[in-house]
């Protein structure tokens, strides 16, 4: 006969201190910014691809259109933007996105048109997120 183990119920103190394994750490600071006409969730020391920016490689750009900031103190929501909040981006490279095929056809006619498109992108690294002159990450 196989050994069977019975689970012991957790106490209230154990349940309060236990965290689920898939939960992200709450100390991670992030911001939601508006860049190139889109809203992006950004974190420090990560890179993102945005629509082409008019900036040279290794140039630093400051985004002031910060919609929301989350840090260890809490969440700050802008109406529409967070006051005195900036995100510093460093341009890593200019590149092109994957090719998208556009195919137009009229049925029962000999009209067919095939075009390809590659979006011009800029890869940026988030250097810092600052609120009120203090870097939160």
From Swiss-Prot:
One of its GO terms (molecular function) is structural constituent of ribosome. SUPFAM superfamilies: L21p-like. InterPro entries: bL21-like, bL21-like_sf, Ribosomal_bL21, Ribosomal_bL21_CS. GO terms for biological process: translation. One of its GO terms (cellular component) is ribonucleoprotein complex. It holds the Pfam family Ribosomal_L21p. Keywords: Ribonucleoprotein, Ribosomal protein, RNA-binding, rRNA-binding. The keyword RNA-binding applies. Residues 1-26 are annotated as: Disordered. Part of the 50S ribosomal subunit. Contacts protein L20. PANTHER family: 50S RIBOSOMAL PROTEIN L21, LARGE RIBOSOMAL SUBUNIT PROTEIN BL21M. This protein binds to 23S rRNA in the presence of protein L20. Belongs to the bacterial ribosomal protein bL21 family. NCBIfam families: L21. This is Large ribosomal subunit protein bL21. The gene is rplU.
């Amino acid at each position: 006969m196989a050994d069977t183990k019975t689970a012991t119920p957790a106490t209230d103190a154990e349940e309060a201190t236990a965290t689920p394994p898939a939960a992200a750490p709450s100390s991670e600071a992030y911001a939601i910014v508006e860049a190139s006409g889109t809203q992006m969730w950004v974190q420090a020391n990560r890179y993102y691809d945005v629509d082409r920016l008019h900036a040279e490689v290794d140039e630093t750009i400051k985004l002031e259109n910060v919609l929301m900031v989350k840090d260890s103190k809490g969440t700050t929501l802008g109406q529409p933007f967070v006051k005195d909040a900036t995100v510093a981006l460093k341009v890593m490279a200019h590149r092109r996105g994957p090719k998208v095929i556009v195919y137009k056809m009229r049925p029962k006619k000999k009209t067919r048109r095939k075009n390809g498109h590659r979006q011009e992108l800029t890869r940026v690294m988030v250097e810092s997120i600052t609120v009120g002159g203090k870097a939160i990450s």
